[in-house]
Amino acid sequence: MNLDIYQKLCSESKILWTQHCLQRMQERDISRADVKNGIATGEIIEDYPDDYPYPSCLIFGYNVNGRILYIVAGCDNINIYIITAYYPDTKKF
């Protein structure tokens, strides 16, 4: 998947959020603005072309305060579907 389509759809606010995703984001203190910024500043680090119902990817980006943020999202070229967003465990690196 091409990051350009994610960034275009993000700039057009064509993002769909599940209740589960929003709940987990709240638990992790991640805002919608953080996710949008992560997509805008990000790069795709893993691609999942066979995911169902839409191809998805892992995006490495930054929240609005410059903290590293990972976003898993799918795309049907009409909307972005946010699957989850989380701060990586930097102790593993």
Mark where each language-model region is.
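Ribonuclease/tRNase effector modules and their secretory precursors
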Residues: 1-93
